[in-house]
């Protein structure tokens, strides 16, 4: 559904919402954005769906493919906009993250994201409590902490922890929480 207006409902006033002071956390309100990977591509002539600015542009990276750059059109859109870049960094084989042989890949990817000079939220290993990432909370936590430590070396980057709230009953998302110091 292509809608240009949305309604947002809150309990109470936005200025009364709890504020934790985390990196890139809005003082009140929310960030609204789109996954920009499917929002047209100037190289293949596909049309732009959304013709106005958003506060957040999201573009997926695939760790297992050793992808180091944003997909198009995000690689065109993000530099042009006054926005936050949100990067869902998916991983299937958590052991790839733990393997120090891939540390240079992680650093190269983060360096590439830093070149956009935008506030950036890295959403690593999302929905870990369902599917293929749900088999080892210990390995997931270790990998998340490794990524978070590397992300926190960048002054305008933050880390998002994003479980699936409908996870399996035998894999509650609390088992995967890496700790407050790793999550912004």
PLM regions with names:
Residues 2-31:
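N-terminal low-complexity, Pro/Thr/Ser-rich intrinsically disordered segments
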Residues 9-13, 42-45, 77-80, 140-144:
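Short low-complexity stretches enriched in small and charged residues
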Residues 17-23, 88-89, 150-152:
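Generic detector of short, locally flexible boundary/turn motifs and exposed helical patches
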Residues 24-119:
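N-terminal carbohydrate-binding/catalytic regions of secreted carbohydrate-active enzymes
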Residues 55, 183-184:
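Receiver (REC) domain switch/active-site residues of two-component response regulators
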Residues 101-183:
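Active-site cleft segment of glycoside hydrolase catalytic domains centered on the general acid/base Glu
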């Amino acid at each position: 559904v292509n809608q240009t207006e949305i309604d947002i409902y809150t309990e109470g006033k936005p200025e009364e919402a709890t504020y934790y002071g985390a990196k890139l956390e809005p003082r009140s309100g929310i960030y609204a954005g789109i996954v920009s990977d499917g929002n047209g591509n100037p190289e293949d002539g596909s049309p732009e769906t959304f013709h106005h600015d958003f506060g957040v542009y999201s573009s997926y990276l695939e760790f297992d493919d050793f992808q180091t750059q944003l997909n198009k059109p995000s690689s065109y859109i993000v530099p042009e906009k006054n926005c936050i870049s949100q990067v869902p960094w998916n991983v299937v084989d958590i052991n790839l993250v733990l393997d120090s042989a891939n540390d240079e890949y992680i650093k190269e990817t983060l360096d590439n994201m830093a070149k956009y000079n935008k506030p950036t939220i890295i959403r690593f290993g999302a929905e870990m409590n369902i599917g293929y990432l749900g088999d080892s909370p210990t390995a997931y936590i270790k990998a998340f902490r490794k990524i978070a430590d590397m992300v926190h070396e960048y002054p305008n980057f933050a880390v998002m922890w994003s479980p699936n709230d409908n996870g399996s009953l035998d894999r509650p998302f609390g088992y995967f929480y890496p700790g407050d110091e790793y999550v912004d």
